[in-house]
Regions:
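Juxtamembrane boundary at the C-terminal end of a transmembrane helix
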Residues: 221-231
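Interfacial loop-to-transmembrane junctions
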Residues: 189-214
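The feature identifies polytopic integral membrane transport proteins across all domains of life
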Residues: 12-23, 45-53, 113, 144-150, ...
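Internal alpha-helical transmembrane segments
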Residues: 1-70
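Small-residue-rich segments of transmembrane alpha-helices in multi-pass membrane proteins
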Residues: 159, 208-221
Length: 231
């Protein structure tokens, strides 16, 4: 008899993975675009690095704050829903038991089996049963603000460090070209890794990330050259 291999599910990664991939891509694109724009204006290496580091610090702080506020709002909504459900279970347990049975009937169970399942779950941790089956809340989907904020800030910093490193090691006459090349490679890698970790086809996701990153750098390069010419 062939041993059955456990399936590798990816849904438990959804919260931190989304924040980490978004943070890394944003760090790469944001700081690379700043660097290319400032370099296109004819600025010195020192000025370019100063602008890039400032963008890294500001971006990491902004990503962390944004994720924390967003996920905290989600957590507040979850707590409010659970509080409401807890009150309804106290005030009308029979009605909530019927509601639970109706949910199971809508999923294909017979009326008798749905009633039996609702009775057994209601005899145990009934709030968890309603949270899972009525509200769609599970431990895997539970909002974690600090985890999301930390993942965003850390990944933004790592992503932003790549174009900064390209500026440090590249000569002045090829600084823009090497920064763009390093950024494209980094975006391709993060796009590919994000797609693979998320269980999605990597080709389309990688191409989408690279195209938008190149577009952002092209725009800031044009602006940088215009400003450098006219100022």
């Amino acid at each position: 008899m062939t041993a059955r291999h456990p399936e590798a599910h990816l849904s438990h990664r959804s919260g931190w993975l989304r924040a980490a991939v978004l943070g890394a891509n944003d760090g790469i694109v944001s700081v690379a675009a700043i660097i290319v724009g400032v370099a296109a204006a004819g600025s010195s290496r020192s000025a370019i690095l100063t602008a890039g580091i400032a963008g890294l610090v500001a971006g990491a702080a902004s990503m962390a704050a944004g994720e924390y506020v967003s996920v905290s709002s989600q957590a507040d909504a979850e707590r409010a829903d659970l509080s409401l459900e807890r009150r309804e279970l106290t005030e009308d347990p029979a009605g909530e038991r019927k509601e639970l049975a109706a949910i199971y009937r809508s999923r294909g169970l017979s009326a008798a089996l749905a009633d039996q399942v609702a009775d057994e779950l209601s005899a145990g941790d009934v709030l968890s049963a309603h949270a899972r089956d009525e509200l769609g809340m599970t431990e895997l989907s539970h909002a974690r603000p600090f985890q999301a904020a930390g993942a965003s800030a850390a990944s933004f910093t790592v992503g932003a460090a790549l174009p900064l490193l390209a500026v440090i090691v590249s000569p002045a006459n090829t600084r823009i070209e090497l920064t763009v090349a390093a950024t494209v490679v980094a975006l391709a890698l993060t796009g590919y890794m994000g797609a693979r970790l998320g269980g999605a086809p990597p080709g389309k996701g990688t191409l989408r990330v690279v195209i938008w990153g190149v577009a952002a750098m092209a725009l800031t390069m044009v602006v940088g050259r215009l400003v450098g010419t006219n100022v």
